[in-house]
Amino acid sequence: MIHYTNIRNIFSVPDTLEDGAITNESGTVKRSSKVSFIEDAKICREIFNIIDYTTLINLTDIEPLQYSEYIVGDEYGWHRDVHDEPYSNGLVRKVSFSTILNDDFWGGEFDIETKNPMYKKRYQTFESEEYNTIIFPAHMWHRVRPVKSGVRKSIVGWLLGEP
């Protein structure tokens, strides 16, 4: 199940960003963006409580949040947020979320593969509305399309639970 909600006044933009490029085995770039992690326990707990209440899934923890900036041409190809094995504490990523922090950019649409026969496409596109949050199972394939103008700013996160 995919949830869509609006979260405001929780985040502040980090001061420094790192190269967030991710490549696959063949060297092809899967993600091009700048990132920073937010480990503020109060913010993480507030987000955890909102999503835990919204999803009604047995969740036990949240990873540090990731702030990302995508400039013109940046994207993140199709991927899932799950790992092959549980973490050392036995937990796995159960729920992912993405919050758009601005709406003064073009492109950078967020797609989730649904394979739902109700849609003509195999995926559903979520338009970039400021502070709207998409909450979805971490095993679902998703992507960020290339940004065409401006800078796309977002917070993403992953909530954990038992397999």
Predicted features and spans:
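Non-heme Fe(II)/2-oxoglutarate
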Residues: 1-59, 66, 75
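Catalytic core of non-heme Fe(II) oxygenases with the double-stranded beta-helix
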Residues: 38-163
